[in-house]
Amino acid sequence: MAIKLAINGFGRIGRNIVRALYESGLSNEIKIVAINELADPEAIAHLLKYDTSHGRFFFPVKLGEDTISVAGDAIALFCEPNPAELPWKTLGVDVVLECTGVYHSREHAQLHLTAGAKKVLFSHPADNDVDATIVYGINDDELKPEHTIVSNGSCTTNCVVPVIKVLDDAFGIESGAITTIHASMNDQPVIDAYHHDLRRTRAASQSIIPVDTKLARGIDRILPKFKGRFEAIAVRVPTINVTAMDLSVTVNTDVDLNAVNNALKAQAKDRLEGILSYTAEPLVSIDFNHDPHSCIIDGTQTRVSHKRLIKLLVWCDNEWGFANRMLDTARAMVALEKITNIK
């Protein structure tokens, strides 16, 4: 029986989830049964079909009366500001993918459960009162059947945490520092405009812009042993997609460049296949656009100083990679419930 998903908020991540589902060939196993979005339906259909970052969607999209169809699959379309009023029970929704970026607490997620959904998965970091924060491939084994409200973390935690885990397992990490070099986002203006963050009042295409980040806190949630041992800063750069992470860690044992790259390459072919990738080609950010991995190591940029300080450059498509992990985590949540029901 197919997994039934609903998407609340059809922005960058919501639309990429639908595209990723159909491009991955999983649309028979997973069905999007509903989308709730306050925007104009014609704009919803148009932006699903045509995307500046990811190109044209080659599955047919048609807008109907209160529906949007993809490859002939009808998806109910709602414009409901109150999630508690959505017909999730009638539609048999297994998991709501909460992609508005507005809701972040257990109280907010409860609105979807009240409407009849079985589970909720946030597409962004949530408050501490959720059942779990998951970075797929690292701690998804901590999911439990009784977990009804889960966060998928952020694109940056999904990018950096697998790398930290590999390095710690191989060499033992003492501490670390990270600079996120992030593509522009939709909270930045095209030309100077008002914003509560004075740096984000400035035109996105004209500056490298420092922004606040809670990445270090996100690492603590996934890997509690590192609480207080990582610091992070972030800047936004004038590109529209693909992010780079400048990761520096000090380790407990002497290492060299080859040992570091070999450890990462080995895990990319083993336990973290599909999550972690490795390249030694002379690539630039656009080359990682539409890459489904959570993180891609640029082996040409690995550096080791005084045998114990490692510096890495890690790439990710902050939209496409994360959208794929949303599908992975949603599948895992439903699979656990089905196993429990069989027992």
From Swiss-Prot:
Keywords: Cytoplasm, NAD, Oxidoreductase, Pyridoxine biosynthesis. GO terms for cellular component: cytoplasm. Its EC number is 1.2.1.72. It catalyses: D-erythrose 4-phosphate + NAD(+) + H2O = 4-phospho-D-erythronate + NADH + 2 H(+). Gene3D superfamilies: Dihydrodipicolinate Reductase, domain 2, NAD(P)-binding Rossmann-like Domain. It is an enzyme of class 1 (oxidoreductase). The keyword Coiled coil does not apply. Belongs to the glyceraldehyde-3-phosphate dehydrogenase family. Epd subfamily. Homotetramer. This is D-erythrose-4-phosphate dehydrogenase.
